[in-house]
Amino acid sequence: MRLKGVLALFSFFTAIPIKSNASLEEIAEYSYISPLIIGISLALIESAVYVLLYRILEALAGIVLLGVVELLRGFNHLDGLLDLGDALMIKGDRERKIKALKDVEIGSGGIGLLLVYLSIQIVALLKLGFSFYTIFYLISSNVLSMTIGLYILSTISPIPESNLGKIFHNKLKGKSTVLLFELIPFISLYNIIVFLVFYMIMHKICRSLGGSSGDIAGASITLSFPLFLLTNEITNLNYSLLSILCYLFLHLH
């Protein structure tokens, strides 16, 4: 595994200032490990920031964390969410929807989907609270959301207009099983249901657009993160390997 390709994942998926001259093909080749490397790294940073903010702002720390979450991601996935929202609002043939997906202007559909995301995200972050489990909620949610975005790219053929989608699909189409195995320590019984339902919805959306794309993957990562986080908080990560390890740690020390 080349270090250059791994480090390039940080510059591609986040705003963390790591210089890399890796090509898009090299980034796509190693992207299957990004849920573990990038997802866990982001969760650790978010957890550290949240702990510091919570000491000052208490419950309101979640609102500030919203900005931190998007800032760490460089707002890249948020752009995909806005584009997908515009495409979903278009009535008519596929060409018009693709035009809206690739258009740089933001329409009412993009704003609407953004409001949906912000509503769920704010509720999830306000409910985060402060406990031993907080870091594990964030780790699980980051890993799961990144995985579902990449899993969509690996299992659904890209639209002809998406160069990024083609590159990632070619590099990931043999890695879908690996992506699912990476989930095992982090996914609970309840999040399996969320994962499957979310994937089926996105699969239907991809069919209406003619395939997957980088924008669709980015939108999936963005929108699924608060859903997984909220599920983790409500269920306390029950029936997951992480929850078992947490239980053993708390009761054996």
UniProtKB/Swiss-Prot annotation:
GO cellular component, one term: plasma membrane
Pfam families linked: CobS
Enzyme class, first EC level, given as a word: transferase
Pathway of action: Cofactor biosynthesis; adenosylcobalamin biosynthesis; adenosylcobalamin from cob(II)yrinate a,c-diamide: step 7/7
Annotated catalysed reactions: alpha-ribazole + adenosylcob(III)inamide-GDP = adenosylcob(III)alamin + GMP + H(+); alpha-ribazole 5'-phosphate + adenosylcob(III)inamide-GDP = adenosylcob(III)alamin 5'-phosphate + GMP + H(+)
GO biological process: cobalamin biosynthetic process
Tagged with keyword DNA damage: no
Cellular location(s): Cell membrane
Superkingdom, taxonomy of origin: Archaea
Keyword RNA-binding included in the entry's annotation: no
Transmembrane segments: 33-53, 56-76, 106-126, 132-152, 178-198, 209-229
The family this protein is said to belong to: Belongs to the CobS family.
HAMAP family: CobS (MF_00719)
PANTHER family (alphabetical): ADENOSYLCOBINAMIDE-GDP RIBAZOLETRANSFERASE
Name by which UniProt lists this protein: Adenosylcobinamide-GDP ribazoletransferase
The organism's taxonomic lineage, starting at the top: Archaea, Thermoproteota, Thermoprotei, Sulfolobales, Sulfolobaceae
